[in-house]
Amino acid sequence: MRVARVVTPLVLVAHGSADPRSAANARAIGREVARLRPGLDVRVAFCEHNSPGLVDVLRDCPDRAVVAPLLLANAYHARVDIPSQIAGCGAADRVLQADVLGEDDRLVSVLRQRVTELRVSRRDNRIGVLVVAIGSSDPVANAHTAGVAPRLLAGTRWAAATTAFATHPEPSLAESVQRLRHMGARRVVIAPWFLAPGRIPDRVERFARDAGLAMAAPLGAHRLVAETVLARFDRAAGARIAA
């Protein structure tokens, strides 16, 4: 008799936003994850603002599940918000939380591609790249995020790269642009370390427009973003099996 293989659901949880483009991007990533892994039960949930909520999705999961945060930084939402929602619906004993996407090499590669989509050559040594992230109240999380900029230069001849945080007053975006110019950049472009469009990326885009700078697209529902989600899922699911 053939025994049916139990497939652990992957619950892809995004923070959620009042901007519908953010939720649309999360769902697009969910579809790409499902396309890359046929047969995997992929469900999309949100911490707030959008539906379905994480608690509702977990209550509908028949058994075990892996919650994969669609987050770049290991900060409040990953360490407090999501775990509390898992515990609050009584699912802590059957749900594993995967690691955040973080500063994965695949995502840095996508960011580099987004910059080149601005018709920026990897061999152009005049280029300075300002990586703009949301920022966190956690300095450790910000330090990890700041590591993206120097890694972005790998395989290029770009003059320099540095990081600024959209929610932090210092250094300001304008100050960071000047820093790149002092580092030898003659043309500065902005690389948004965001998964999706939204109100904060729009604010950065307004700055770029006013400053006469080109700004790349967010990471979006790129195949490598979905691959990173699956890598986090596989690691969490594998840890459960090993245990």
Functional labels for PLM-detected ranges:
Residues 1-243:
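Active-site-proximal alpha-helix that buttresses catalytic centers in soluble enzyme cores
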